[in-house]
């Protein structure tokens, strides 16, 4: 049996990018859960078989645990919305994870500022 040709390597990136755009719109316009406030989708990682997608998000205010729980409970609703928009055979199961990158960057900036301030005091 001949080998099946592998999909283009950047197709997964294109699908992830489209999922990110569509999810941003779905959350902002159609999700009515009060536990979900100002959520920003930072990144989407799709498995090679498109069965699962990790959705990394950040938020300005609110409880991280509560928002993560609300988004994971709404995953079926959001997946159904993606099914109507995407034209792929399998719409992935969505797994929402809080992205702590911005928090870590702020902590690093504070540490750098502290080091610079202590260095200038030493001079």
From Swiss-Prot:
Short name of any one Pfam family annotated for the protein: RBFA
NCBIfam families in UniProt: rbfA
Statement: the UniProt record of this protein carries the keyword Transcription: no
Similarity field: Belongs to the RbfA family.
Quaternary structure and interacting proteins, as annotated: Monomer. Binds 30S ribosomal subunits, but not 50S ribosomal subunits or 70S ribosomes.
Organism: Variovorax paradoxus (strain S110)
UniProt GO molecular function: ribosomal small subunit binding
Function of the protein: One of several proteins that assist in the late maturation steps of the functional core of the 30S ribosomal subunit. Associates with free 30S ribosomal subunits (but not with 30S subunits that are part of 70S ribosomes or polysomes). Required for efficient processing of 16S rRNA. May interact with the 5'-terminal helix region of 16S rRNA.
Name under which the protein is recorded: Ribosome-binding factor A
Keywords carried by this UniProt record: Cytoplasm, Ribosome biogenesis
